[in-house]
């Protein structure tokens, strides 16, 4: 086994604006992380991945040197996320769902990029939905990065039940997993970006004082009222009602914090509608929902999903593990990869 001659591996994750490199022992001990404020947005803006390459190179060098190591001791770098896209380091085609951890390991794309580092980089493919002949494009979706997060989460949940992992962010992801723990597809929304734009660049910016809900200001009642308003009145009308409440209500309901929570509920209704009308999982009532992410989406999505009653159960995920989910999932695939080469 190649890894047996080395003592460490690195997992590398690049997103829109940031890159993270994590150091691990071959046995799975997490040793630390280095970050770089560079991502695929830089490539999109520059028309070249030169800046991204430089940032990744510096990040990897710092990680290795700060640990008192050399690249000769690194068995490989396992890269996931948008780094495998056309605005990353190297574009690698998606896997087609369904896909298990072993499938990702078997389909790893190895590459030598000496202008980035002297160690082979093993690119972990993203996933695209399977599209049956004659099916509409509305059933197609893609992800790069959330698949490794999902594989990490699956280590903490038993096989034998179907899951949907809800991973909020700028782009919200619903990742569907069958009872054999294979990823069967995903569903993407723009909820995070919508919330940011409405909060800062619409007439409602005044009502919410251009502020987002935090874990300290979260109000379940206001979120659910906004959620139900969007269900009953439609998205646009529910949004404008925030301004009406601000102008004509008194007390708590006239506060910017109430308005921000109400707005969160209105926007999250889009996610629930998308889930309800999805074509990947027809038996939502038997599916376990796991919400993993940061506040206020963690509480907001848990509450509106529970209120909607679409899923068998809805659970919040929390962990004290110091490594990010993406790194833990990439390490799992690395382990499968090395074991498959024995």
Regions found by a protein language model. Name each.
Residues 9-13, 74-78, 163-167, 289:
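Short glycine-aspartate micro-motif
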Residues 9-51:
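Short glycine-rich, Thr/Ser-proximal phosphate-binding strand/loop in the N-terminal lobe
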Residues 227-274:
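Adenine-nucleotide phosphate-binding core of ATP-dependent small-molecule kinases
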Residues 41-48, 128-229:
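Glycine-rich phosphate-binding loop plus the immediately following alpha-helix
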Residues 58-76, 272-284:
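Phosphate/pyrophosphate-binding loops at sites that engage ATP/ADP/AMP, CoA/4′-phosphopantetheine
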Residues 18, 283-304:
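Glycine-rich phosphate-binding loops at beta-strand->alpha-helix junctions
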Residues 66-140:
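Short beta-strand-loop/turn "lid" adjacent to the catalytic site in phosphate-handling enzymes
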Residues 300-303, 316-342:
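Glycine-rich phosphate-binding/hydrolytic loop that grips phosphoryl groups
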